[in-house]
């Protein structure tokens, strides 16, 4: 019987209709996995071992009571077969520390998804710059550099490097009178880096989320369409969605980075594509499977767990 630990934000506050971690837990429970619920703050390292104050949990699709804790355990994490790291950004100093702690468990043969070193090494926004599909990009905390970039490329998008869900993303047109205060806010008055990209007008047609499992793309993607007063293609920011088959360029981008993802132990990934550009490689806690499954009648959680079981067989 597979022992699966899932590190996530408090389960008491999730929306089960949308929550990818919950969907994975439901599928794992169907397969009779031992399911251990863990919050990041409850993990600790002591004298060569890594422990967690965890709960053996059961889940059900019930919007009033979707989980119950069966038993509390202080578990040595090397006893688990697989750990899913599903803590949402921001990628802060505590997140960084936990990647070092989890990396230690890999020495005991525990499969961790996604690989802690890669979570640490590959920022979701910056990692796209290694590929030819990235839009024109500036990373800076200098107001002068941002002004210069805007002079060259016109309308721009400014966003923080370590957040999610469209949080603090700004669309700045040329000669926008608010550009100075926006730059001050995002860069903390010139002390923090932010990411600036050329505005891609195809965002009006939607931001495409492509799910990659062990380097292979699902054939349908979640297209998040900004509402009339927005440029952010994030469901958390009020976007609507559609489910569409992958285009030729989507397959091209996916296949181009497939070997990179597999080599780095990035098993469960969400690519964000606007037009023909790769804008993010989501590796911390990719979402979107519930929306895709609502139209594309397949269990994405099942495909993920099938892949995990194959990886466990290879490891053991």
UniProtKB/Swiss-Prot annotation:
PANTHER family: GLUTATHIONE SYNTHETASE (PTHR21621:SF4), RIBOSOMAL PROTEIN S6 MODIFICATION PROTEIN (PTHR21621)
EC number: 6.3.2.3
Residue span(s) of domain ATP-grasp: 123-309
Binding, ATP: 149-206
UniProt catalytic activity: gamma-L-glutamyl-L-cysteine + glycine + ATP = glutathione + ADP + phosphate + H(+)
Pfam families cross-referenced by the UniProt entry: GSH-S_ATP (PF02955), GSH-S_N (PF02951)
UniProt similarity note: Belongs to the prokaryotic GSH synthase family.
Cited Gene3D superfamilies: 3.40.50.20, ATP-grasp fold, A domain, ATP-grasp fold, B domain
Cofactor note: Binds 1 Mg(2+) or Mn(2+) ion per subunit.
Protein name listed in UniProt: Glutathione synthetase
Keywords: ATP-binding, Glutathione biosynthesis, Ligase, Magnesium, Manganese, Metal-binding, Nucleotide-binding
Enzyme class: ligase
